[in-house]
Amino acid sequence: MAKNTSITLGEHFDGFITSQIQSGRYGSASEVIRSALRLLENQETKLQSLRQLLIEGEQSGDADYDLDSFINELDSENIR
């Protein structure tokens, strides 16, 4: 259910919203704000996923890594 909410925007964002409506990309200020909120929600979801993956990576412990083996593997790939 839609809800009316009052917000205060500075001149910069007010002008940006107006330009988006005048360009024809959006039909109203509400459409611009909803689009912006969808982008923010998407960004926050991705950020939360990244944070969770970082935590899992840190908790998984140190990886077995041998620099010499890695260099040899790269060298053998270049020979092919």
Curated annotation (Swiss-Prot):
* Pfam families assigned to the protein according to its UniProt record, in alphabetical order: ParD_antitoxin
Q: Which family does it belong to?
A: Belongs to the ParD antitoxin family.
| Gene Ontology terms for molecular function | toxin sequestering activity
The species this protein belongs to is Vibrio cholerae serotype O1 (strain ATCC 39315 / El Tor Inaba N16961)
Keywords on record: Toxin-antitoxin system
Instruction: Note whether Methyltransferase occurs among the keywords.
Output: no
* Domain of life of the native organism: Bacteria
Function according to Swiss-Prot or TrEMBL: Antitoxin component of a type II toxin-antitoxin (TA) system. Neutralizes the effect of toxin ParE.
Keyword presence, Chaperone: no
Q: What is this protein called?
A: Antitoxin ParD
Q: Which GO terms describe its biological process?
A: detoxification; regulation of DNA-templated transcription
